[in-house]
Amino acid sequence: SRGYANHGWLKTHHTFSFANYYNPERVHFGMLRVLNDDSVAPGEGFDMHPHKNMEVISIPLKGYLRHGDSIKNSEVITPGDIQVMSAGTGIVHSEFNDSGNEQLEFLQIWVFPREENTKPHYASYDVRPVTSEKNKLSLIIAPDGSAPASINQDAWFLSLIHISEPTRPY
């Protein structure tokens, strides 16, 4: 089972223990600490809040995700983009739905870092496929520079490029 909370402006599903959801059997999986599926109402979001020693990946599925932080980054990302924030020694950031009339749906993933107390870092990446091939996996995050994005952990993230319609009913 997953945790679920409805705060009016935020509907969120938690794969692991998070906020008011606690399941001692679901605190983390290896280095994966958080896998949240969030839906944020238009114009709403998370005010400035701190993180330390965590790799935070945000993946918009629908809508416009506005990010701002204490190391002078400010931008809006959309589906096909990802943002990677290495909190290191500490960073303060906010995330908001930049639309006035459309829901924002995004995944937020937290990964424990390989090395703690590094310099905070933020970057966004366009991970839209550069191929027209269907049903392929695309490497979007890797620790060794072999993907558009990297994090401070031995972790690889793959994205399904495109699922074609089945040619026959199942």
Regions inferred by a protein language model and the residue ranges of each:
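Single conserved hydrophobic/aromatic residue that forms the stacking wall/gate
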Residues: I161-E165, P169-Y170
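Short beta-strand segments in beta-sandwich/barrel cores
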Residues: S39, G63-H67, I82-Q83, E116, ...
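Short acidic-glycine-tyrosine-enriched beta hairpin
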Residues: I71-S86
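A short, N-terminal "cap"/entry segment at the start of jelly-roll beta-barrel domains
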Residues: S1-P42, F46-D47, E75-I77, F96-E105, ...
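Histidine-centered divalent metal-coordination motifs
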Residues: H49-H51, H93
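Short beta-strand His + acidic residue motifs that chelate non-heme Fe in jelly-roll/DSBH
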Residues: H67-S70, M85, V92-G100, R168
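Short N-terminal edge-element motif at the start of the domain
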Residues: E55-I59, L65-G68, N73
